[in-house]
Curated annotation (Swiss-Prot):
UniProt site positions, description: Cleavage: 658-659
EC number: 2.7.7.49, 2.7.7.7, 3.1.26.4
GO cellular component: cytoplasm; nucleus
Gene: TY1B-A
Binding positions (Mg(2+) 3): 1051, 1093, 1126
Name of the protein described by the UniProt record: Truncated transposon Ty1-A Gag-Pol polyprotein
The organism of origin for this protein: Saccharomyces cerevisiae (strain ATCC 204508 / S288c)
Amino acid sequence: METFTGYLKSTCFHQISPYPPSIMSIQVKVHANILILSFIECLRMPMHRQIRYSLKNNTITYFNESDVDWSSAIDYQCPDCLIGKSTKHRHIKGSRLKYQNSYEPFQYLHTDIFGPVHNLPKSAPSYFISFTDETTKLRWVYPLHDRREDSILDVFTTILAFIKNQFQASVLVIQMDRGSEYTNRTLHKFLEKNGITPCYTTTADSRAHGVAERLNRTLLDDCRTQLQCSGLPNHLWFSAIEFSTIVRNSLASPKSKKSARQHAGLAGLDISTLLPFGQPVIVNDHNPNSKIHPRGIPGYALHPSRNSYGYIIYLPSLKKTVDTTNYVILQGKESRLDQFNYDALTFDEDLNRLTASYHSFIASNEIQESNDLNIESDHDFQSDIELHPEQPRNVLSKAVSPTDSTPPSTHTEDSKRVSKTNIRAPREVDPNISESNILPSKKRSSTPQISNIESTGSGGMHKLNVPLLAPMSQSNTHESSHASKSKDFRHSDSYSENETNHTNVPISSTGGTNNKTVPQISDQETEKRIIHRSPSIDASPPENNSSHNIVPIKTPTTVSEQNTEESIIADLPLPDLPPESPTEFPDPFKELPPINSHQTNSSLGGIGDSNAYTTINSKKRSLEDNETEIKVSRDTWNTKNMRSLEPPRSKKRIHLIAAVKAVKSIKPIRTTLRYDEAITYNKDIKEKEKYIEAYHKEVNQLLKMNTWDTDKYYDRKEIDPKRVINSMFIFNKKRDGTHKARFVARGDIQHPDTYDTGMQSNTVHHYALMTSLSLALDNNYYITQLDISSAYLYADIKEELYIRPPPHLGMNDKLIRLKKSLYGLKQSGANWYETIKSYLIKQCGMEEVRGWSCVFKNSQVTICLFVDDMILFSKDLNANKKIITTLKKQYDTKIINLGESDNEIQYDILGLEIKYQRGKYMKLGMEKSLTEKLPKLNVPLNPKGKKLRAPGQPGLYIDQDELEIDEDEYKEKVHEMQKLIGLASYVGYKFRFDLLYYINTLAQHILFPSRQVLDMTYELIQFMWDTRDKQLIWHKNKPTEPDNKLVAISDASYGNQPYYKSQIGNIYLLNGKVIGGKSTKASLTCTSTTEAEIHAISESVPLLNNLSYLIQELNKKPIIKGLLTDSRSTISIIKSTNEEKFRNRFFGTKAMRLRDEVSGNNLYVYYIETKKNIADVMTKPLPIKTFKLLTNKWIH
């Protein structure tokens, strides 16, 4: 102790020698650092806590605890100790939060490579590379056979392209370790080229790469567990990794309460599509060695396929994996490979000598099941269907007789004998796999004889009124549901007939086009039937197979729903069809129309329905009804193009690039005159004088409105050129004959810095105007039309802008500063909208309807605003007059039409010529305007010739051959097409909704102005000229109606556009009055009529909801919303509560949304006969008789 004390003293004085003032104090109280250092020198142990505790408990004497100053002991550092006991830094909790907050989803990725796994076949991967998104925690795994640079580069290219295309995101940072596979020059250049920052871990700091390391460890734990549980061989290890990744991406995190898929905006995992890893299944062998070989191969389910809607299944007997949907789950506890003796699965050679006739083992209900499951079969079932099968002559005929009363589980001796010689039984087989599962049961529904077919053409589905099931006492159908495959893996016995209660309900699929009557089965019964799915055998048709026994396809509805349906359909302007006499179904090959060898690629880009004229004796559109000179019916693509699944390639057009550039430079149609044309060089003295008068009137109005600062003129050189706006006078003659002049700014060359790009100039939507007019007719409203003179000049301008003075001042070198929003400026429309909106709200007591700009209302008046035009609707004319008085206090307001007469009043509202008799009718047309404008288009009209009775002919196809014209001619023809289609579009969307299909189709060919396209456009203009007197007719709704009824009638023409696109159309009606329509090409490629119909309906729902809100705001009566379609399968899908996964995720999303709309927003969906579907005119060209029949009740 003395030695230690002496050493301590010497050490203390040595340590404090640089600080003489503290020597005396240290002698009284020892510094903790000195004490610790002394222990280090003597004992090489700096533990100050132990030293302090020892002094306190007197295990070390000479010093007391109070003799030492412990204040700086914690912060003391000993270099030798730090060197001797150096460790890695501790993990800082929450250290990655800054990355999560700084980056958007898919911008920061973690990656790591695992491997190699030894003793595997060459075909099996030895490595895998994983990626994890920092924000969403979504994970990806990719197999690798090696760690070469090109292999890693391929994976990086794949993942980056996937994220860019699927999530519209760009990866910014990728964190990885310092392995050579990541630090090589090839990958570094690739990342640098794509603007991605590589973030490497520091040396020997694997914990900094914890996200990727932990993921690999978790996936490997899952892999080992799955392989152990399933008993599958080790070379399937990556399949277990992929299965685990799918599951882990779908499980919610305890911290965020969401799964990685939810964070990424993806739908949740449909558990019904996921099977346990290693689940025993039987896979259909679509390519057997012979017709008598078994069709099933035992296998094990691994994971859902990445590249299809199928499942990856391992087939031990073939030593390979397959991607298929044709499998059946084996229900049993055994899941090991030793369950089957695959060596015993050999076939008796004697069976090859059997020559019995072979009949189809596939019945029509198997095809329906395939459609219902939303799967694609590897086998063409249609080729095995026989409409009139002969009586089977082989030994199996007795076993499948529909009149046999033997229970389904029993078989004849012959069938047993055949089954015993077919295959040697495995050593250990699931008890459910028996002859009753392999061979068809005796009581099977035979393939029905078609008694009636109603084809809807391309606008709907093919409806087969076919009894797919025999009478209840004679049929027992084994079905399988793909959605229930993973719900019950226990043994399940066969069910008996008395356990079921069949009710005919429509079952449909997203991808199919057939709507058939099949039994409704309970959930418990479905689980029992899962394992019994087996093909049916065609047999003789039942005796009573007539239309009288057919149960009609009808979704159950309540009495109130039926009343609602009757109420909705009663007011619609649907055609009256004469009763049809029953007709027999003709021989399918008797009345096939001839095929024209000169068929081209598209029918007017779609004019000429792909399915409308190829269906035999189509009730929807009969060839006998076609009064045109059409002699041929054709498909969308010609016969030679149908040899390939791919659409024909588009042909090149001469001068394509130059033509596109030329289109951009084409000037719009100019209907006005410049100053020199109207005044300076105008040789018409009378017209010149009128324009001069209009010129001075405009100048006086500008000065009156204090449009610019008249006190000071600015030198042009002193002003920033970008703030100088060119100006000009334009002159035109209005429809009423008056001559007008307008001083405008050249906003087309205005600099972007001189206006706020975020401001919007709003005008009333045409649907809002049509809705307001319809409500005015039903409620006996007065309609008052106003005009505000020089409306824009009432709005102040905030920016500093200058213009040249008008020509008559003769001050070309000077500038004047604007104070008002001159016509033509980019911001003028927005400034005026904000000005008048503020005045109507504050001074007139109005409020703007949310979501419908320029529609204002209060308790008495509704106002629709279109720039300087105002339309007022009110039950009390005095309320309109009160608004007018308030407006006149601030604005120069002209009353165009007060609307006080009880007789017919004529209006000219936004181009529509309206005839309105309050409480009776309203007629909307454009006869005067079309009579004036159409002759000016230089179209060879035939005013004295025979009038066209339809806007286009079915079967006329646009030839997409090369366009051999020069640049100047191309510009001229495109300019002409712009004029013609522009006017047609204006008229079509105003009120001629029956022309929208032709207008939309021809508009797609504006940049392809071939002679044929121009001729078809001329024909459309000629039809508009011949029918220019047609009007949209509205009649007042019944006064007893308590509700407003808003209906959308939808239709789709499947695949009648180039590249298999479909044409969709919708017509909107309010209280039986057509207020709008739309015809357009579907944005997605549909694979069936049902998908096309779903797409059409989904396009109508948003506008239907918006219109519903507007109507409720303008009129307080309750509203009923309805959707009408001629596709029963679509209605079945929308009304179904089945949660099965759809074959296509895009249409699945649309269908699920429609279900939500129907169930949550009081939206009624009803069926309408195809012959009464007036939306048919929106999707395809129709024969004259059909076109007239569908349109004569609402436009004539």
